[in-house]
Amino acid sequence: MMNYKFISTIKFKEDLSKLDNSVVKTILKYIKKLELSDNPKVYGKELSGNMAGLYRFRINNYRIITKFENDKFTIEGLAAGHRRNIYNIYSKRLIK
């Protein structure tokens, strides 16, 4: 089976730049684990409602929101942030 490749959107990179360095290192380490997995979806949870089709991954108190392109074996990083506000932040991006 092929490994997935993680692709960061500009917004995802902006989100990471707002986080503490130690948190960013933990998130990047987790992303590497996803890339090396044959089936990274098992580590996450599929979202519903206005985020249907997207997946979220828990990294301590932080979350990353992603979209899978299965035919290309890619995971697109859409948003990253604290669990308290990540869903509100991403919902606002969907409205724009």
How would you label these PLM feature ranges?
Residues M1-K5, E14, Y62, K67-K96:
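Enriched for short, Lys/Arg-rich terminal
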Residues K32-R56:
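A short, surface-exposed loop/turn module that caps and links secondary-structure elements
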Residues K11, A52, H82:
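Residues that form or immediately flank small-molecule/cofactor binding pockets and catalytic motifs
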Residues M1-K29:
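Arg/Lys-rich, positively charged N-terminal/basic patches that mediate binding to nucleic acids
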